[in-house]
Amino acid sequence: MADREEALREFVAVTGAEEERARFFLESAGWDLQIALASFYEDGGDEDILTLPQPTPSSVSRGTAASDHRVTSFRDLVHAQEDDDEEEEGQRFYAGGSERSGQQIVGPPRKKSPNELVEDLFKGAKEHGAVAVDRTAKSSGESSKPKPFAGGGYRLGATPEEESAYVAGERRHNSVQDVHVVLKLWKTGFSLDSGELRSYQDPSNAQFLDDIRRGEVPAELRRLARGGQVNLDMEDHRDEEYVKPKSVFKAFTGEGQKLGSTAPQVLSTSSPAQQAENEAKASSAIAIDESEPVTNIQIRLADGGRLVQKFNHNHRIRDIRLFIVDARPAMAATSFVLMTTFPNKELTDENQTLKEANLLNAVIVQRLT
């Protein structure tokens, strides 16, 4: 009974649980303190339990003549671990200490607040050579610094008789480029330049933050530079919530070649009266058998116009093509295809009837090729 009371007191001292709750776990474990503690922390879901290995008899501390105690106290075990980093390993508890064995319970690591994490990042960067820069002075200095011209040109002759000579410009390897990145440290995460917020707690960002803390350039930034120099600025926004910056339009500054249009613009030279006359002729050219089923087909033209024509169900898709050419004679020399809208599909077999192609009362779009 005395052993059970001792186990109950140690359980309460280690876990801080109420006596009734402690008794429940001990009774469930058959009054085995180690099993009860393990069950308690598994129920909590956070704590890890580590059992210290049994030392050999030669490593056991022997008492002096002045003291006949052969049991290591909690105070001795705690003092032996004072040099450990409690912030990294979590709070330690000891239970069941004896001459030859002991149980050490290590709580979960204390998570750092975002403010502490940002402070550590700046501290680590400064320890590895980073310097604080005045943002206003930096921006004004960068804008006023002239950039030398690195292109080619012609050196003019000093006299009329002296010929001009072409001078080649500086060659730069396209594969090597300098990269300037701004790392913004916010209240709940960080962002790169105008990118999305990345959480401090996301495991996929742990390596990136560790590299910054060690004063190293993260691998993802080195890949951007392709062997060039990476200039990294860190901005402290730890007291601010992340605000997504407004997207800024950036004009294309690269090089390219102007290609010919694959879809030449169709210019209609017909007057409105002439166009109406052409549409009337095209409509009359479609022979409609009133004794057979009829359907209306709406045609959206590539020039923005719209035609609506009545067809029999046994008319074919090629009849629609001929109708378009008759209504818009300028398209006779233009290559185009006919497509459905929903689903968007090209009508490749123009020998199909409208009924076979499921085009009854459909909308057809003309697309230039």
Curated annotation (Swiss-Prot):
<dbReference type="GO" id="GO:0005813">
    <property type="term" value="C:centrosome"/>
</dbReference>
<dbReference type="InterPro" id="IPR036241">
    <property type="entry name" value="NSFL1C_SEP_dom_sf"/>
</dbReference>
<dbReference type="GO" id="GO:1904780">
    <property type="term" value="P:negative regulation of protein localization to centrosome"/>
</dbReference>
<dbReference type="GO" id="GO:0007030">
    <property type="term" value="P:Golgi organization"/>
</dbReference>
<feature type="compositionally biased region" description="Basic and acidic residues">
    <location>
        <begin position="67"/>
        <end position="81"/>
    </location>
</feature>
<keyword id="KW-0963">Cytoplasm</keyword>
<feature type="domain" description="UBX">
    <location>
        <begin position="291"/>
        <end position="367"/>
    </location>
</feature>
<dbReference type="GO" id="GO:0043130">
    <property type="term" value="F:ubiquitin binding"/>
</dbReference>
<feature type="region of interest" description="Disordered">
    <location>
        <begin position="46"/>
        <end position="115"/>
    </location>
</feature>
<keyword id="KW-0333">Golgi apparatus</keyword>
<dbReference type="GO" id="GO:0000045">
    <property type="term" value="P:autophagosome assembly"/>
</dbReference>
<keyword id="KW-0446">Lipid-binding</keyword>
<dbReference type="GO" id="GO:0031468">
    <property type="term" value="P:nuclear membrane reassembly"/>
</dbReference>
<dbReference type="GO" id="GO:0046604">
    <property type="term" value="P:positive regulation of mitotic centrosome separation"/>
</dbReference>
<comment type="similarity">
    <text>Belongs to the NSFL1C family.</text>
</comment>
<protein>
    <recommendedName>
        <fullName>NSFL1 cofactor p47</fullName>
    </recommendedName>
</protein>
<feature type="compositionally biased region" description="Polar residues">
    <location>
        <begin position="260"/>
        <end position="277"/>
    </location>
</feature>
<dbReference type="InterPro" id="IPR012989">
    <property type="entry name" value="SEP_domain"/>
</dbReference>
<dbReference type="GO" id="GO:0061025">
    <property type="term" value="P:membrane fusion"/>
</dbReference>
<comment type="function">
    <text>Reduces the ATPase activity of VCP. Necessary for the fragmentation of Golgi stacks during mitosis and for VCP-mediated reassembly of Golgi stacks after mitosis. May play a role in VCP-mediated formation of transitional endoplasmic reticulum (tER). Inhibits the activity of CTSL (in vitro). Together with UBXN2B/p37, regulates the centrosomal levels of kinase AURKA/Aurora A levels during mitotic progression by promoting AURKA removal from centrosomes in prophase. Also, regulates spindle orientation during mitosis.</text>
</comment>
<dbReference type="GO" id="GO:0000132">
    <property type="term" value="P:establishment of mitotic spindle orientation"/>
</dbReference>
<dbReference type="GO" id="GO:0005634">
    <property type="term" value="C:nucleus"/>
</dbReference>
<dbReference type="InterPro" id="IPR029071">
    <property type="entry name" value="Ubiquitin-like_domsf"/>
</dbReference>
<dbReference type="InterPro" id="IPR009060">
    <property type="entry name" value="UBA-like_sf"/>
</dbReference>
<feature type="short sequence motif" description="Nuclear localization signal">
    <location>
        <begin position="109"/>
        <end position="115"/>
    </location>
</feature>
<feature type="domain" description="SEP">
    <location>
        <begin position="178"/>
        <end position="243"/>
    </location>
</feature>
<feature type="region of interest" description="Disordered">
    <location>
        <begin position="260"/>
        <end position="280"/>
    </location>
</feature>
<dbReference type="GO" id="GO:1990730">
    <property type="term" value="C:VCP-NSFL1C complex"/>
</dbReference>
<dbReference type="Pfam" id="PF08059">
    <property type="entry name" value="SEP"/>
</dbReference>
<dbReference type="GO" id="GO:0043161">
    <property type="term" value="P:proteasome-mediated ubiquitin-dependent protein catabolic process"/>
</dbReference>
<dbReference type="Pfam" id="PF14555">
    <property type="entry name" value="UBA_4"/>
</dbReference>
<dbReference type="Pfam" id="PF00789">
    <property type="entry name" value="UBX"/>
</dbReference>
<feature type="short sequence motif" description="Nuclear localization signal">
    <location>
        <begin position="172"/>
        <end position="175"/>
    </location>
</feature>
<dbReference type="GO" id="GO:0005829">
    <property type="term" value="C:cytosol"/>
</dbReference>
<dbReference type="GO" id="GO:0008289">
    <property type="term" value="F:lipid binding"/>
</dbReference>
<dbReference type="GO" id="GO:0005795">
    <property type="term" value="C:Golgi stack"/>
</dbReference>
<keyword id="KW-0539">Nucleus</keyword>
<dbReference type="InterPro" id="IPR001012">
    <property type="entry name" value="UBX_dom"/>
</dbReference>
<keyword id="KW-0206">Cytoskeleton</keyword>
<feature type="region of interest" description="Disordered">
    <location>
        <begin position="133"/>
        <end position="156"/>
    </location>
</feature>
